[in-house]
């Protein structure tokens, strides 16, 4: 890609956007349990007479809200810095759908994996090593859907909806698995 080659920038902008989202979410997910572990509150949470699934729901919801707030800032900045000179398609607002579906999946899977990496020495690296392969199908589908929405080429919107359906199916399966496995992750 050369400077001024507007089509080239738009063609890989979906991948750049999701790389930005993944790395910022990994930073936030690494810190999601830091307050509880540093002050010893995690033991108090575990002693409370509530189901561990409720703890997962609360942590996943707080991680989701954090990620949505980060995206509220970073996505407009991404458009300003990377796509300000590019011609965007009229379908560009459709990127909100893969952003929402992808963020839900990142928060759900990331909550489970960050819980598993709480007490490890290199938890920052371990979370990235665990997260990226596990979340690859979700990221692939979201990058595909985001790229289609940004380019807006006629006849490719079937790919958008297929990718979005794949991401939503991933969310359902992986969040259900995380919900069921969270008690074991907390106990270890």
Task: Please provide the spans of the model-predicted regions.
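Membrane-interfacial helix-loop-helix connectors in multipass membrane proteins
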Residues: 3-12, 75-98, 146-164
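Long, hydrophobic alpha-helical segments
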Residues: 13-29
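Transmembrane helix boundary and interhelical loop/hinge segments in multi-pass membrane proteins
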Residues: 26-46, 60
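Selective transmembrane-helix segments that form parts of the transport pathway or gating/packing helices
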Residues: 50-79
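A structural motif at transmembrane helix-loop-helix junctions in multipass membrane proteins
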Residues: 87-88, 97-132, 184-188
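Transmembrane helix segments
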Residues: 113-162, 166, 170-172, 176
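Junction motif at the cytosolic side of a transmembrane helix
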Residues: 171-188
């Amino acid at each position: 890609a050369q400077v001024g080659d507007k089509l080239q920038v738009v063609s890989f902008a979906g991948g750049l956007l999701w790389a930005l989202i993944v790395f910022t979410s990994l930073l936030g997910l690494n810190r999601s349990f830091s307050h509880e572990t540093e002050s010893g509150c995690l033991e108090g949470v575990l002693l409370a007479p509530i189901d561990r699934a409720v703890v997962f729901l609360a942590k996943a919801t707080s991680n989701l809200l954090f990620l949505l707030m980060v995206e509220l800032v970073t996505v407009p900045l991404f458009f300003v810095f990377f796509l300000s000179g590019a011609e965007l398609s009229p379908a560009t607002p459709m990127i909100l759908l893969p952003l929402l579906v992808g963020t839900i999946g990142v928060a759900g899977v990331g909550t489970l994996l960050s819980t598993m990496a709480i007490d490890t020495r290199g938890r920052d690296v371990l979370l990235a090593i665990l997260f990226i392969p596990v979340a690859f199908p979700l990221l692939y589908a979201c990058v595909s859907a985001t790229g289609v929405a940004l380019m807006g080429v006629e006849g490719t919107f079937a790919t958008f909806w297929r990718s979005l359906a794949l991401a939503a199916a991933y969310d359902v399966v992986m969040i259900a698995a995380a919900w069921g496995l969270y008690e074991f992750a907390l106990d270890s």
